[in-house]
Amino acid sequence: MTNSIRLFVGCASLILVLALYGGAAAGPLDPGYPKAFSCSACHGFAGASGADTVPVLAGMQSWYLKKAIQDYASGKRPSPEMESYSKMVLELGVDDVAGYFARQKRQPSPVRLDSAAVERGRAASTQCVVCHGAQGKGDPAKGIPDLTGQPPGYLKNQMLLFKADRRSPGDETLKALKALMRTIPDEAFGDLAAYYSSLR
């Protein structure tokens, strides 16, 4: 995507948002909303699309969202589609976009979960809690994100990508996580995903 096209998309998004909300009396417009508008096609206007394989952005930590955008834009986290959008977000203002989604009310995934899978995942999560905590909330000080309420399909896909070293390949900070993923059979990832998706 060329710079001129990115600029056009950003300006068009801003014009549309102002047209929709300019006459509203609900308070000042969040400065990040116009810049995050292009994300809404996949992630929803409030950062929660309801799709099983698309992550919930609403209420996620801003530091994590910012890092994810930067990693996608640089190619460190491979995804051709996300790379182009993330580069545009960097130009528009990554702090505003990450802050906007972080300020939205957390909306856990509505995907229906199998209760038996949740319980199996709970039993299998003993090694995960070392880093992500007993409630799955992570540790911002160590760069560990909150897993709770994410769509199970998304969580399962990410675990499989880590196991195959296809997410952030070569990243030494994720070496221990990837080693752990390789000890887990593929069929167990669905259970772990269901468990963490069930947490609030």
Predicted feature locations:
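Electrostatic cytochrome c docking/interface patches
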Residues: 17-36, 48-53, 102-125, 143
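Conserved small-residue-rich
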Residues: 119-157
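The canonical Cys-X-X-Cys-His
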Residues: 39-46, 97, 121, 126-134, ...
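Bacterial N-terminal signal peptides that target proteins for export
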Residues: 1-12
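The feature marks the first
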Residues: 29, 34-74
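Stable alpha-helical elements in mature extracytoplasmic
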Residues: 35, 53, 61, 68, ...
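Axial heme c-ligation environment in periplasmic c-type cytochrome domains
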Residues: 50-56, 72-105, 109-114, 141-146, ...
